[in-house]
Amino acid sequence: PRKGETNSAQYFFISEEDFLHKKNSNFFLEYAEVHGNWYGTSVDFVQSKLNDGINLILEIDVQGFRQINDLSFSCESIFILPPSIYSLEDRIKSRGDEDIEAIDLRLKNAKEELTFANEYEHLIINDSFDVAAQELYKIIAKEKPLNKENNEELQQFLAQLLSY
């Protein structure tokens, strides 16, 4: 866990051995190894919440999204874009919990993930937290149908990000 994270709050922390056993037992709806750590979403947890009529927001990486997408799972997909690669680097550095090699790996992986952004139904630029939160709310509340393919400004922004 990172500083400030507690078990059962941000994540459920388990040993790598336990995780791999659960992965091999089809315990996870999606899973991925990201920056040397394993992450996954429990099928039972998701199913129980959906059975209770609760909509979920899964904060997952591209690997997990693609696994869920391959299952034809009914969902809205939203890719959160950084305002620039430089600001993303600043945000990672400001956490103060990564060495330079880890920061470089995160940036390399982020650039790779950006190439998959157009597989998502919605794109949000996280330049201002308040504005990004409002955009997210509009999508969730179905107030903003966003056809990203016809949004030339958004496509130009994504092309600019990918050019770094």
Regions found by a protein language model. Name each.
Residues N26-L29, R91-E98, I139-K142:
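Conserved AAA+ ATPase "sensor/coupling" helix adjacent to the nucleotide-binding pocket
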Residues F19, I57, A110, I124:
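Residue-level signature of catalytic and energy-coupling elements of molecular machines
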Residues R2-N7, I68-S72, T115-N118:
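Short loop/helix-cap segments at secondary-structure boundaries that form the rim of catalytic
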Residues D97, T115-Y164:
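NTP-dependent small-molecule kinase module
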Residues C75, S87, R95-T115, D130-V131:
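Ras-like small GTPase catalytic G-domain
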